[in-house]
């Protein structure tokens, strides 16, 4: 998440949950009470959250037409979404408990034996939550960005799909499913 305030830019990698509400919904998150994002809160007007989907390096050798002509260069294919809105900090123990439970559930639900907060000492969890401050970002603007070699020929895109589907690097197979031959 990128925040600008008091002439400084603050960039943080934070776990966020999408929550229904307003036109585009809201993003819910939390930081420690000593975190710069919270300390600079009053000077921050808007924030931008960036969600990156699968992305991958594209070898020039994978382009059929370019390989023949020798007129090719490496590329990068990607899909991303930017969500922008106003941030509001929430100092509420009940909200924080519900938020942390929802965040944990979103990460644990697909596990064979998911962990839940009922397995932890309630006093310990309360002490952890007390050191955190919640926030919500009311999403006012969404912007999707993609580059999937759409300017290439159908033969080139089909070749990319085949190569990416066999590429062991993270995200390559998922990206192959997004490219339209």
How would you label these PLM feature ranges?
Residues 1-181:
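Binding-site signature for planar aromatic cofactors or substrates
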